[in-house]
């Protein structure tokens, strides 16, 4: 199962485990201009950047992340394999980015989990559970209920007699 240890992120404690052949060395939230920030509005562009250090050659690692709402509801959980990205072999430092062009999340606090697994998803190299908070603030939408703003339109036609 690997090592279990407490880690710190912005003064917050989180669960971390994994064997350590690859380590997550940093996670940043970036806006459309590439500036680091921790708050966004619904509809903004957001990039999640994960920096890593592979201490030895690792074939086809899988990079994953999951967003959780503050009440623990998981919003999504994509990974590089599901996206069809062939990472190949990694060694040394690197970064991988997950780009969201139109952030559909509604205003509240969210927590990000990030992980690096082997290609079979059976072995964690490094796993940071709900370690990185970010906030969606009001102003990007009038909607307030639910998880996301769906890209939809309304169409109304009165009934004529």
Q: What would you call each of these model-derived segments?
A:
Residues 1-161:
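Localized sequence-composition bias
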């Amino acid at each position: 199962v690997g090592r279990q240890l407490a880690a710190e992120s912005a003064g917050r404690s989180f669960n971390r485990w994994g064997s350590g052949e690859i380590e997550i060395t940093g996670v940043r939230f970036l806006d459309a201009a590439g500036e680091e920030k921790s708050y966004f509005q619904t509809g903004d562009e957001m990039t999640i950047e994960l920096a890593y250090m592979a201490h030895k050659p690792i074939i086809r690692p899988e990079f994953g992340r999951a967003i959780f709402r503050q009440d623990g509801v998981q919003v999504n959980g994509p990974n590089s394999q599901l996206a069809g990205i062939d990472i190949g072999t990694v060694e040394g430092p690197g970064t991988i980015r997950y780009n969201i062009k139109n952030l559909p999340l509604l205003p509240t606090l969210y927590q990000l989990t990030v992980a690096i697994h082997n290609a079979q998803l059976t072995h964690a190299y490094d796993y940071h559970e709900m370690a990185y908070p970010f906030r969606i603030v009001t102003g990007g939408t009038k909607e307030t209920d639910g998880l996301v703003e769906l890209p939809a339109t309304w169409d109304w036609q009165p009934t004529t007699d």
